[in-house]
């Protein structure tokens, strides 16, 4: 393939295009590389670019010579507007935007920004791929020069809706190998995998200890939905495998063997994580009494070892837990410590375990916290793609992430030839990232028909096309069409409610539900009510979450009915319990009693006994809100209670919060409350909060508080 090269300067960035003689209307893709990678890996880069070109994407190789995120963003935006850019990949040491004041764009990250900036900022490439977001430059890190800190501006969008997809190809630490050798080998692997031309038909999913409250119903329903999302599975032409952390005392070896299967196409791994660890088993899963005793002995040995005063700790457990001294006598014996350490290491997958490992799954989703911390020198997801084997792309998170998310949303599009990048773009959050080649895609199971990979990126404005696609039988095509038509204002909440309450396919109903909840309408509460009783666990779970965030009085009876229901599933119960604790004391207790009237049996007697604890929690919430107005209560306590509003979205005492905002002379707490109001995006009181923030901003004398109030208005109306 012939290439032509020319040099162009935009803003502060000098870059090199390596381009084919392609038609102007062809979609394009950008490869951003640092100068050293270009100098040392040019041949591999050109082969990779040629493989992307062969798949229909005009490819630009752009050399970053200035290390300035704003300039890279400018180039990408220019290509997006003028050259049909659909995605980009950052290879090597490309600047890392570290985002501040944007925690509401994450699913779970809520760290105090007073902590060191490298920890309290979110490494995010949404800076590069979402052009609706606006950022204010703050500074460059004085130690790690790749870190550039930005504040999310209130002038831009307050939700993620990426215009293009993006990914990182950044080598982690490998002993004895340079980053250039690793990049060369990886790009050669990508080219080979692109040439292999395979359909997706073999999928494995996994659940680690403690994930989604260990709900087996959640995992069973995930199987049902995956079979629905991938018709090839329903037709008996593929294979769907499930591994649970309870299958073995240490499930690690089974999971690694499964991931190394040559014929595995996709692996979806739900577990907890860190930048260097995939947490699988918290402790050995055992069913025999002798193993329970072994684990108990090991537990107390570990507690004593980690104590500041080991002698006092040992005596404490002996006296308070009746632990025999013989159980812990060898706590510091070197051989015993080694054995305990080996048991701990066998519980999880660590970076060291991946040395020489050859994963077979082409695409792996790590639905876990921190596994995608690409900004660090070493990170576990990077080892999956840079190892030998077949894995070319991983989806992972740069910081912590929420368990209760729809991680498999639209994943069946992969069966239709949609690239991993175009699929991932539909559910990017601030922390979610692709590690590897985002253009990788499986061959479509449909030999004829529309090119959905092209349509998802370049036909979004064709309303007539998506109306036609909304009539498709394939649930993922219908769900995608609904999403696009809703974004275009063509499909309304009433139409979506009909779909939510009548469609036979669980993921189609869930998409309808999710879309209704995104925009204020009279259908929000009816949608939540219907969702609470849907037969799809994930939809019920989301309805439970939204019931706790909405807190409409119209939902209270349903919440309390489910609160005492014996058939409620574990993770839905977790969400419903939270919702039940957010209402005013008297109303909540009356509703609770109402659902127990006339009910007999041990189960309901236990629920009556639980009322005392519910009343204690409700009274505690009321006390916390009232203390905001008490000048005798220390600031630290008030700060904690205000910060907690980000999660609770408490509306029962909204008048007290408004009063505090108007009357308090503590500007730091007022600023904190103004920011906390911005989390009430799904509250039944959202409009009231918006009106209050507007009025308060109009008379606010503190400029910082005023700006935060206006930012909150933007967040609640975006």
Predicted ranges, named:
Residues 25-29, 54-59, 83-87, 197-204, ...:
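Loop/turn elements at helix/coil->beta-strand transitions in domains of secreted/extracellular proteins
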Residues 121-186, 294-406:
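Catalytic cores of nucleophile-dependent amide-cleaving enzymes
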Residues 473-474, 504-505, 535-537, 565-569, ...:
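Short inter-helical turns and helix N-cap capping residues of alpha-solenoid HEAT/ARM repeat scaffolds
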Residues 1-24:
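Bacterial Sec-dependent N-terminal signal peptides
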Residues 459-468, 489-501, 521-532, 552-564, ...:
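Amphipathic alpha-helical scaffolding segments comprising HEAT/armadillo-like alpha-solenoid repeats
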Residues 70-249, 258-266, 273-288:
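Structured catalytic cores of large enzymes
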Residues 452-457, 476-488, 507-520, 540-552, ...:
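Structural detector for internal amphipathic alpha-helices that build alpha-solenoid repeat scaffolds
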Residues 407-491, 506-511:
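Caspase-like cysteine protease fold
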């Amino acid at each position: 393939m012939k290439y032509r090269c020319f040099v162009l300067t935009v803003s502060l960035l000098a870059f090199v295009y390596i381009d084919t003689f392609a038609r102007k209307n062809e979609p394009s893709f950008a490869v951003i590389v640092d100068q050293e990678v270009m100098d040392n890996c040019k041949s591999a880069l050109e082969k990779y670019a040629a493989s992307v070109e062969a798949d229909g994407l005009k490819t630009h190789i752009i050399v970053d010579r200035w290390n300035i995120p704003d300039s890279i963003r400018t180039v990408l935006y220019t290509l997006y507007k003028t050259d049909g850019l659909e995605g980009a990949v950052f290879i090597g040491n490309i600047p890392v935007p570290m985002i501040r004041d944007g925690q509401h764009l994450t699913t779970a990250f809520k760290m105090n920004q007073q902590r060191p900036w490298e920890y309290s900022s979110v490494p995010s490439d949404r800076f590069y791929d979402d052009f609706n977001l606006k950022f204010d430059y703050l500074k460059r890190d004085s130690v790690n020069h790749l870190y550039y800190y930005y504040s999310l501006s209130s002038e831009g969008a307050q939700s993620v809706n990426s215009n293009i997809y993006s990914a990182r190809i950044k080598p982690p630490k490998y002993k004895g190998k340079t980053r250039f050798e690793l990049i060369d080998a990886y790009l050669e692997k990508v080219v080979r995998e692109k040439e292999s031309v395979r359909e997706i038909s073999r999928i494995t999913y996994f659940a680690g200890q403690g994930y989604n409250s260990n709900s087996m119903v959640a995992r069973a329903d995930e199987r049902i939905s995956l079979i629905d999302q991938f018709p090839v599975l329903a037709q008996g032409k593929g294979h769907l495998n499930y591994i649970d952390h309870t299958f073995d005392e240490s499930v690690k070896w089974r999971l690694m063997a499964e991931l190394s299967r040559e014929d595995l196409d996709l692996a979806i791994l739900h577990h907890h994580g860190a930048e260097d660890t995939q947490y699988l088993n918290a402790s050995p899963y055992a069913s025999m009494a002798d193993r329970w005793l072994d684990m108990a002995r090991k537990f107390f040995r570990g507690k004593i070892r980690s104590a500041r005063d080991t002698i006092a700790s040992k005596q404490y457990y002996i006296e308070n837990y009746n632990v025999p001294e013989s159980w812990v006598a060898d706590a510091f014996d070197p051989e015993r410590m080694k054995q305990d350490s080996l048991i701990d290491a066998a519980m999880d997958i660590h970076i060291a375990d991946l040395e020489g490992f050859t994963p077979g799954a082409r695409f792996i989703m790590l639905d876990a916290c921190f596994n995608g911390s690409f900004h660090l020198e070493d990170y576990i997801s990077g080892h999956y793609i840079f190892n030998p084997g077949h894995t070319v792309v991983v989806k992972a998170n740069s910081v912590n992430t929420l368990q209760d998310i729809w991680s498999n949303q639209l994943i069946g599009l992969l069966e239709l030839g949609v690239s991993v990048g175009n699929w991932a773009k539909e559910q990017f959050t601030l922390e979610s990232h692709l590690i590897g080649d985002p253009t990788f895609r499986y061959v479509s199971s449909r030999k004829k028909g529309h090119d959905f990979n092209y349509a998802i990126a370049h036909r979004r404005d064709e309303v007539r096309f998506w109306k036609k696609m909304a009539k498709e039988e394939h649930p993922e095509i219908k769900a995608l069409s609904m999403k696009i038509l809703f974004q275009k204002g063509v499909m309304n909440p009433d139409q979506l409610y009909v779909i939510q309450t009548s469609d036979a396919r669980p993921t189609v109903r869930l998409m309808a539900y999710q879309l209704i909840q995104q925009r204020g309408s009279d259908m929000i509460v009816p949608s939540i009510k219907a969702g609470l009783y849907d037969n799809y666990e994930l939809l019920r779970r989301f309805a439970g979450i939204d019931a706790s965030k909405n807190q409409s009085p119209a939902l209270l009876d349903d919440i309390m009915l489910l609160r005492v229901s014996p058939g409620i599933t574990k993770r839905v119960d977790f969400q419903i319990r939270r919702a039940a604790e957010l209402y005013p004391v008297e109303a909540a207790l009356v509703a609770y009693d109402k659902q127990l009237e006339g009910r007999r049996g041990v189960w309901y007697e236990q629920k009556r006994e639980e009322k005392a604890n519910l009343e204690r929690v409700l009274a505690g919430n009321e006390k916390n809100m009232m203390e905001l107005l008490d000048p005798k209560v220390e600031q630290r306590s008030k700060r904690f209670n205000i910060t907690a509003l980000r999660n609770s979205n408490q509306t029962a005492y909204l008048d007290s919060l408004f009063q505090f905002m108007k009357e308090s002379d503590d500007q730091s707490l007022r600023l904190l409350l103004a920011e906390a109001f911005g989390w009430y995006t799904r509250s039944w009181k959202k409009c009231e909060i918006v009106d209050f923030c507007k009025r308060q901003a109009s008379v606010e004398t503190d400029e910082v508080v005023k700006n935060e109030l206006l930012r909150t208005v933007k967040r609640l109306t975006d």
